[in-house]
């Protein structure tokens, strides 16, 4: 997909342009730095194309991924994600992730 530059710089450029669509597939990248940046980009650009994948990622084994996903879903403003975040929060054991999920649900009240 990317011929020039690294993935992180491409994500930053997409975020700057307000279009996360070109980097949606990077939310599943094996490099955690790339993955988290792509997840954050989805929220920053309100990329609805990533919503379903992000909802599924609320169950990711990595706590940082789950926390970033909650924030991204809130940034996207997908009100349908609120129930999924609430369900994930009800069983979440990591305090940092649970806090991110609670903040995400509060932010989604504004949509």
Task: Annotate each PLM feature.
Residues 14-28, 47-59, 78-90, 111:
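Amphipathic alpha-helical scaffolding segments comprising HEAT/armadillo-like alpha-solenoid repeats
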Residues 90, 95-111:
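Eukaryotic acidic, Ser/Thr-rich intrinsically disordered low-complexity regions
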Residues 1-4, 11-17, 44:
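Alpha-helical scaffold domains
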Residues 10-13, 41, 72-75, 79, ...:
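Core register positions within helices of long alpha-helical scaffolds
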Residues 7-10, 38, 69, 101:
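Conserved hydrophobic register position within alpha-solenoid helical repeats
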Residues 27, 34, 42, 58, ...:
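Fold-core signature of tandem repeat domains
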Residues 30-31, 61-62, 93-94:
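Short inter-helical turns and helix N-cap capping residues of alpha-solenoid HEAT/ARM repeat scaffolds
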């Amino acid at each position: 997909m990317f011929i020039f530059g690294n993935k992180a710089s491409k994500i930053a450029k997409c975020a700057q342009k307000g279009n996360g669509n070109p980097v949606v597939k990077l939310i599943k990248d094996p490099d955690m730095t790339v993955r988290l940046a792509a997840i954050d980009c989805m929220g920053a650009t309100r990329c609805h194309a990533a919503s379903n994948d992000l909802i599924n990622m609320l169950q990711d084994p990595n706590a940082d991924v789950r926390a970033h996903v909650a924030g991204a879903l809130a940034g996207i403003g997908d009100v349908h994600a609120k129930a999924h975040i609430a369900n994930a929060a009800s069983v979440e054991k990591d305090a940092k992730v649970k806090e991110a999920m609670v903040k995400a649900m509060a932010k989604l009240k504004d949509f």
